[in-house]
């Protein structure tokens, strides 16, 4: 089985370097790290290349055989300055990350294409690929929106990120994933949820804190996995507000997600 990655949103109350130890003790061998916030004032754990905190993180990674799969979240907004992310990309490369999660909060299409292209160019020397995530409350709301942006940018290191919850809440289907060119899919985030969407006022809260463990809900996760490329990087993004103990939360998430993946295999 490929290394299943622990998405940082699952345990956002824990930052590096302790995040590495927690992930290892919960049975994960890969993690994502939130170096940048997806919103002003949001939670993030910035690391600078060469800093003591980053060296400590690398030391624990080596000690526990845990890799950093990705960094997040680069936010494209009307006031985004591309160079502001250079330090995060350098730190990500030093951590060995290969992918960057991109959120788009700008409805001006031409500006989004220009800035995403510039971010691709900034990321390329660091060996980083950018994965555009779609969410129903953002301008890039649907799978089709993300695909359209990625195709227009037309860079070799930009892809689509498919989050199981966001796919279903935006009206997407497994069939829409099956119809995609698999080369466009950069990574996948798994969780579960009821099939019925909450009211509009509850969509964001569900995504950020009230997801379900794989197998607890009704999302067509097995069918989704069957529609994906076999080698696509997979992370477990399951923030569980009901479970306050971060170690228990991470352990439950790993067990449930690996059970699902074993069934697929």
Briefly describe each language-model feature range.
Residues 6-9, 44-47, 102, 136, ...:
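Short, flexible active-site loop motifs that bind/organize anionic cofactors or intermediates
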Residues 32, 67-72:
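Short, conserved beta-strand segments within well-ordered enzyme catalytic domains
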């Amino acid at each position: 089985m490929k290394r299943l990655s622990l998405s940082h949103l699952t345990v956002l109350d824990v930052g590096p370097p302790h995040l590495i130890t927690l992930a290892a003790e919960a049975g994960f061998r890969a993690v994502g790290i939130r170096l940048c916030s997806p919103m002003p004032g949001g939670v993030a754990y910035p690391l600078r290349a060469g800093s003591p905190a980053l060296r400590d993180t690398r030391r624990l990674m080596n000690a526990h055989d845990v890799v950093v799969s990705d960094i997040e979240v680069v936010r494209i907004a009307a006031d985004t300055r591309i160079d502001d992310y250079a330090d995060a990309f350098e730190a990500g490369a030093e951590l060995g990350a290969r992918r960057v999660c991109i959120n788009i909060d700008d409805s001006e299409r031409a500006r989004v294409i220009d800035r995403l292209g510039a971010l691709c160019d900034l990321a390329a020397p660091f060996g980083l690929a950018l994965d555009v995530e779609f969410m129903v409350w953002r301008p890039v709301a649907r799978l089709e929106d993300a695909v359209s942006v990625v195709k227009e940018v037309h860079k070799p290191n930009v892809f689509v990120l498919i989050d199981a919850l966001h796919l279903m809440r935006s009206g997407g289907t497994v069939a829409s994933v099956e119809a995609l060119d698999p080369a466009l899919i950069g990574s996948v985030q798994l969780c579960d949820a009821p099939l019925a969407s909450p009211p509009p006022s509850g969509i964001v809260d569900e995504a950020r804190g009230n997801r379900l463990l794989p197998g607890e809900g009704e999302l067509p996760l097995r069918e989704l996995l069957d529609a994906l490329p076999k080698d696509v990087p997979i992370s477990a993004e399951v923030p569980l507000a009901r479970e306050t103990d971060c170690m228990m939360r991470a352990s439950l998430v790993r067990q449930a997600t690996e059970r699902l993946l074993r069934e697929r295999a």
